[in-house]
Amino acid sequence: MIQKNWQTLEKPSKLDITPGSDPKREATIVAGPLERGFGLTLGNAIRRVLLSSLQGAAVTSIHIDGVLHEFSSIPGVREDVTDIVLNIKAMALKMGAEGPRRMRLRAEGPCEVTAGMIETGADIEVLDPGHVICTLDSGARLNMELTVAMGKGYVPASQNRPEDAPIGLIPVDAIFSPVRKVAYKVENTRVGQTTDYDKLLLNVETNGAVSPEDAVAIAARILQDQLQMFINFEEPQAAVAETKADEIPFNKNLLRKVDELELSVRSANCLKNDNIVYIGDLVQKTEAEMLRTPNFGRKSLNEIKEVLAQMGLHLGMEIPNWPPENIEDLAKRLEEPY
């Protein structure tokens, strides 16, 4: 019965994703309930992988006509070459090819040179076209070639200089990671009457080359691949079949009765009078519907919203195929000892 070591652990049935101000770049991803201690274990591991191991595109070197090294200045260009290199490092790129690719930037002043003015190939996308690279005065010209490559993590400029580098090639510190920021915290959440389960909240910000939820999925897959080598056994086929037969197609909390919620007498009576038996019945109600319930006020509404939030649920949810025909049997299976 070795499979009981992982089958009996509490785990979330799905992730709750809340987009940030820029949905393509920012999101808060909530996973719960988790066994006590697993929030910290998973949060720290996922954060480290997100920041260090995801593949991305970055400029690895540049060549500017008339410039021999990065400590030069260009006539008519307000920024010196060092500042231009720093601005190029901060560009966000997305590339669909493996090998190095070259881009070209041509500009004539007076103008503000932005990333959107770069001539890219079909397999390179500039994700922040408004990003400023430099400013040209009247009569100034800029002709630059940029080399883009795929990689992971941070690679210093010294490693981006080819052995046969031509005179004037300026290597650039490459920040390949598409993930800009990751922060996590662990909160308590409740399952039934037990309140010391973990809830993991991941705040992820990317440069737009990959969405936050996809970045977390890739990080989890990397961890899965790395951990696979430590498993020195195969799960018995009977155990696999038993697991599939025992699967409950809903969040387990939805199958619990509202009687298990620690609500005030008024709130509990209102739910009972409205024939709300299971938490799955409750979460499909909207706030407006709840407030139309006799004797149910704003205080009771806030109380229920807080209790549901602790389980990663909320009012107004859409639950396909609810209620299941065998809801009583499914609910009883939750009460059965392992």
From Swiss-Prot:
This is DNA-directed RNA polymerase subunit alpha. Residues 250-338 are annotated as: Alpha C-terminal domain (alpha-CTD). Belongs to the RNA polymerase alpha chain family. It catalyses: RNA(n) + a ribonucleoside 5'-triphosphate = RNA(n+1) + diphosphate. GO terms for molecular function: DNA binding; DNA-directed RNA polymerase activity; protein dimerization activity. Residues 1-10 have a biased composition (Polar residues). Residues 1-24 are annotated as: Disordered. The keyword Ligase does not apply. It is an enzyme of class 2 (transferase). SUPFAM superfamilies: C-terminal domain of RNA polymerase alpha subunit (SSF47789), Insert subdomain of RNA polymerase alpha subunit (SSF56553), RBP11-like subunits of RNA polymerase (SSF55257). Homodimer. The RNAP catalytic core consists of 2 alpha, 1 beta, 1 beta' and 1 omega subunit. When a sigma factor is associated with the core the holoenzyme is formed, which can initiate transcription. DNA-dependent RNA polymerase catalyzes the transcription of DNA into RNA using the four ribonucleoside triphosphates as substrates. One of its GO terms (biological process) is DNA-templated transcription. Its EC number is 2.7.7.6. It comes from the Bacteria. The N-terminal domain is essential for RNAP assembly and basal transcription, whereas the C-terminal domain is involved in interaction with transcriptional regulators and with upstream promoter elements. SMART domains: RPOLD. GO terms for cellular component: cytoplasm; DNA-directed RNA polymerase complex. Residues 1-234 are annotated as: Alpha N-terminal domain (alpha-NTD). InterPro entries: DNA-dir_RNA_pol_insert (IPR011262), DNA-dir_RNA_pol_RpoA/D/Rpb3 (IPR011263), DNA-dir_RpoA (IPR011773), RBP11-like (IPR036603), RNAP_asu_C (IPR011260), RNApol_insert_sf (IPR036643). Keywords: DNA-directed RNA polymerase, Nucleotidyltransferase, Transcription, Transferase.
